[in-house]
């Protein structure tokens, strides 16, 4: 703090030098003239003296003021100063100013004399608004209160001696002078109002008694004066009356926090999300995410949790849990009480297994006395067929599974639904890879085996070799002390077939096969497909109960009402008992082969359960895709070259064939080339398949199906390649060649013409003759043909006759009519298409 002289301090505080010297002397600071300087220590002592003792200094000055020459007003100016320590950095103090009181009283007296002049009084009243503005700005500096017919002045401007420094001398003096002037104006304004009010009251009370005490008027009430001062403050700077300002009321939202945490019982189901779990525990999802993070699990509020993790979270947060039984509905619907029904003996379900071309279908064909093999391409069974055969000693239901390794999954499903396995082994070929696979499936399903050693009519047949090879694979014949019956048969001559059937029936007696013939039916789906005009068609093997037309059934994720039933001979039936294969119509979709079939009394529950199964299947598929993406991401890390992908869209005639081909193609994937089947289905190739192929640059493969006209036009425009197959060997071999880069760019098989059947005639010489219109290409007499129904291949063979009117023709071109006779095939119908193709040379 800089040194300051007594004169400078007097000038800044607007005090007389003598008065200031006396005040300094009273504080113990001896100074004789205005030129003496105050040291920082003396200034500090001055501040301490002022702040100590009392914070409130009271001064009172009483003067008399004459009014109208008759009355006097005793003006008592009582002054209080309160020093508040607002901020430590701004320590304030107050200097007593007794000299100011006399000056202020003199000013008030002079102004009261002016009141006598009415014009001046009105002018002063008009100026109250300006005084009011100044008063608001100095609200914390001065708040005058009138008491006992005088004036009580509070909070006169504080003189902050601590801030008196050399640099701020002029500013401090100016602010102090301005504060004193404003306070005096405030006193004067209220005095004027009081005097005016008094005069008005005197005029009204002229007739009343004179006032006592010689004062001439009654003492003013402090409350009334305070109200008067408040009225002066209720006008704004423009003269308008102010409204009363009320502090806004804040609504308090209060609640009582529970002393103890509420323990909840949370029902946990599989796949519960974090948000669902938080909702059940009445907490925020972020809290559960924190708990998971502490457990080392990164999760979001929409992520699904397994039951074990959810249980740990619930226990960690102090709640109880109960596990939700998701199979409650399924158990309530599918479990049938058969305690009141009696069991009866049923026919055995026999599955014929063996290596390809060992004579399985030929053996079954001989048993059924039909020509099944002649209707199948290449002599290979393409999908499971179920047939019921009646013998002299009882009925037998046969399931004919394909022998090719691609149909492993189909054979596995067949083994699950069968009672006895007939293992067909060619006597001239011995045990082959598919033979070993059939043995493994039969043993895994714990199904007894009956070995049929086929083709014993061939000169090179060696049944003993077959027995020894099977014995090495733990299939021991009865003659060697085992439990497996061996029967030598010939599907060509029929030798030993009767002995084989007798062995099967004998084995079934040992098994004591029984089933419930009454009650709601249960079974298994053998095969399914989608037919145009009929919708989803499923081949079902009834295992228990009685399946009737009109029953509500549930097959996997599909449900429906049985609209019609056909047996293995194609005849309509009303009911089917145990061990009976039937073909049913009326399902909502195509079920997967191997799905269980159950009859449900309530159609609503069947629909609900189907939706629940579908949701589970969808969630499982999504989880599997996520895991595959993750594994692919790690597998592809660190590889130098990019893996080539062969994209395929696969369409087939039946569900089982599509699944088997899909598995075979996926097994062909290598580190360099990956087979990716982006879509698969049953039925004809449609325009949507072509659109998908264009978007994904995929090859469209049809197995025993063709593309419809819209798909063909779109494929020609977009340049999509169709490849048709009816032999699975050729399909797999071509895909292998494509993967290795050895596939020839030329088509091995080319369709040269298509004729549409418009009408069917009968001929005594050729049988059924199809009246056709050639709609594409050219139909040649010498080329092989296929018969398509709803774009699905139903027959393959050659033309027996081709006529234009009554004349024989070697070829018929597009737009012309012709008559076509198909060799060894009479089931031609209107709407069928006859496809003519040729085999091109491979380069």
UniProtKB/Swiss-Prot annotation:
Cellular component GO terms, alphabetical: cytosol
UniProt keyword annotations, A-Z: Cytoplasm, GTP-binding, Initiation factor, Nucleotide-binding, Protein biosynthesis
InterPro entries: DNA-bd_dom_put_sf (IPR009061), EF-G-like_DII (IPR053905), IF2_II (IPR044145), IF2_N (IPR006847), P-loop_NTPase (IPR027417), Small_GTP-bd (IPR005225), T_Tr_GTP-bd_dom (IPR000795), TF_IF2_bacterial-like (IPR000178)
Keyword check for Nucleus: no
UniProt biased composition (Basic residues): 207-219
Residue segments, region G3: 400-403
Binding positions (GTP): 354-361, 400-404, 454-457
Main location (coarse class): cytoplasm
Gene3D superfamilies hit by this protein: P-loop containing nucleotide triphosphate hydrolases, Putative DNA-binding domain, N-terminal subdomain of bacterial translation initiation factor IF2, Translation factors, Translation initiation factor IF- 2, domain 3
Location of the region described as Disordered in the Swiss-Prot/TrEMBL record: 198-219
Region annotation G1: where it falls in the sequence: 354-361
Residues of the tr-type G domain: 345-512
UniProt subcellular location: Cytoplasm
Span list, region G4: 454-457
Protein purpose: One of the essential components for the initiation of protein synthesis. Protects formylmethionyl-tRNA from spontaneous hydrolysis and promotes its binding to the 30S ribosomal subunits. Also involved in the hydrolysis of GTP during the formation of the 70S ribosomal complex.
Family the UniProt entry places it in: Belongs to the TRAFAC class translation factor GTPase superfamily. Classic translation factor GTPase family. IF-2 subfamily.
Protein name per the record: Translation initiation factor IF-2
Species assigned in the record: Francisella tularensis subsp. tularensis (strain WY96-3418)
